[in-house]
């Protein structure tokens, strides 16, 4: 059987040349990273306080 391979170029557009776009993207990425870290910390706190109930609820919802 013949297989086709396609290559996609990386987003190359006019936005690559704008330094402001890169700085804004970096700022957004840092904010999202901070929000994700905060959410993971909150999950860790819940698990530390009540891991048994968390696991029980997870299994009841179909988790393994």
From Swiss-Prot:
Superkingdom: Bacteria
Keywords associated with the record: Coiled coil, Isopeptide bond, Ubl conjugation pathway
Gene Ontology terms for molecular function: proteasome binding; protein tag activity
Post-translational modification: Is modified by deamidation of its C-terminal glutamine to glutamate probably by the deamidase Dop, a prerequisite to the subsequent pupylation process.
Organism, scientific name: Mycolicibacterium smegmatis (strain ATCC 700084 / mc(2)155) (Mycobacterium smegmatis)
Region ARC ATPase binding, annotated ranges: 21-58
Pathway, per record: Protein degradation; proteasomal Pup-dependent pathway
HAMAP family hit by this protein: Pup
Classification lineage: Bacteria, Bacillati, Actinomycetota, Actinomycetes, Mycobacteriales
Cysteines paired by S-S bonds: none
Name of the protein: Prokaryotic ubiquitin-like protein Pup
InterPro entries with a match to the protein in the record: Ubiquitin-like_Pup
Pfam family, one: Pup
UniProt remark on domains: The N-terminal unstructured half of Pup provides a signal required to initiate unfolding and degradation by the proteasome but is not needed for pupylation, while the C-terminal helical half of Pup interacts with ARC to target proteins to the proteasome.
GO BP: any one term: modification-dependent protein catabolic process
């Amino acid at each position: 059987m013949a297989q086709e391979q396609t290559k996609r170029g990386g987003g190359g557009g006019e936005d690559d040349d704008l330094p402001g776009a890169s700085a804004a993207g970096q700022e957004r990425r840092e904010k999202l990273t901070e929000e994700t870290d905060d959410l993971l910390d909150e999950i860790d706190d819940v698990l530390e306080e009540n891991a048994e109930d968390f696991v029980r609820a997870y299994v009841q919802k179909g988790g393994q």
